[in-house]
Design a protein with these regions (language model features):
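Eukaryotic scaffold repeat domains enriched in small/polar residues
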Residues: 1-304
């Protein structure tokens, strides 16, 4: 099924992932590709990390400990090695792992008594890493802060908090570091405010992007373009200037259905998204999309 137009035409295949009989997707929240174009899916059923090759063939799986809480998923290369950074919303942790699943670093809740207590929970939804190794954690389902750590896990600072003014957030659901302009910038999917905020790495607001989006979830930067899943049933591409390029697989009826996102199988269509939550692209520009639905869905968009 071909979707898109012009330079953004793709063959859409929601049946790409070939799972073994003993693994079933839960809610598919995150997806990344490594330097060899292998694809890793982060979902809520054990084993939570499932590895495929570019053709969708199953390669490996691990990560039972993240069952139920698997959410944010980020791949970062350091010193010639690639690492996975994850957030677990159930246990309130961030972890750094090798591509084989060995845990290198774990971060719990920051010790901020003025921000967190028994009632005000810490629920990290996403994580990103700057070129210098600093780690940024978005507390999207908790108290709407972004926390910054050094590469070794030492706490540096926090910024944000609840609000709608620049620099404040309402569900900072996704976070990523953009280096397209040379100077790194922090992109935050301020989902509850229906916008994207761009900040310095110190947390100072720079600009707000709020057109042609509804519920931005996360980001992936490929070449000059930014790709993001809009939870309200579409994947969106913006250019380097933060301007709209196109929507892919848009279905503006899906998220309005009773019971969404857990819709009956008969509703899903091969050329439309329902609840895209995570996205990535490989070297060739093929796009992979993970959807938030009870039995998961992972789609490959092969660039034409």
């Amino acid at each position: 099924m071909i979707i898109g137009s012009g330079t953004h035409r793709y063959e859409m295949n929601p049946h790409w992932a070939q799972l073994p009989e003993d693994i079933r997707f839960g809610y598919c929240h995150g997806i990344v590709t490594d330097s060899e174009n292998n694809v890793y899916v982060f979902h809520t059923n054990a084993p939570c990390v499932v590895k495929f090759d570019a053709e969708g063939r199953y390669l490996d799986s691990w990560g039972d400990e993240f069952a139920g809480g698997a959410h944010g998923f980020y791949l970062h290369a350091e010193g010639g090695e690639e690492f996975l950074y994850i957030t677990d919303t159930s246990r309130g942790i961030v972890a750094k792992l090798t591509l084989a699943g060995e845990k290198v670093l774990e971060l719990g809740a920051p010790g901020l008594t003025d921000a967190y207590d028994a009632e005000r929970k810490y629920v990290p939804t996403d994580v990103a890493v700057a070129p210098n190794g600093d780690i940024y954690v978005a507390d999207g389902y908790g108290q709407n802060w972004v926390h910054r750590y050094a590469a070794n896990g030492d706490y540096i600072a926090s910024f944000g908090g609840t609000g709608s003014e620049p620099g404040k957030f309402k569900c900072p659901h996704g976070i990523s570091v953009d280096v397209r302009r040379g100077e790194p910038e922090l992109y935050v999917a301020d989902r509850g405010n229906h916008r994207i905020q761009v900040l310095t790495l110190e947390g100072e607001p720079k600009r707000i992007v709020d057109e042609n989006m509804d519920m931005p979830c996360s980001f992936f930067f490929h070449g000059d373009e930014m790709i993001f899943p809009d939870l309200h049933s579409r994947v969106t591409i913006f250019g380097r200037d933060d301007k709209f390029v196109t929507h892919l697989g848009e279905d503006q009826l899906a998220y309005k259905q009773q019971g969404w996102p857990n819709l009956p199988a008969a509703y899903f269509r091969d050329n439309r998204f329902s609840s895209p939550h995570g996205v990535c692209a490989d070297k060739a520009g093929n796009i992979y999309v993970a959807e938030w639905t009870v039995d998961g869905r992972v789609t490959k968009l092969t660039k034409k």
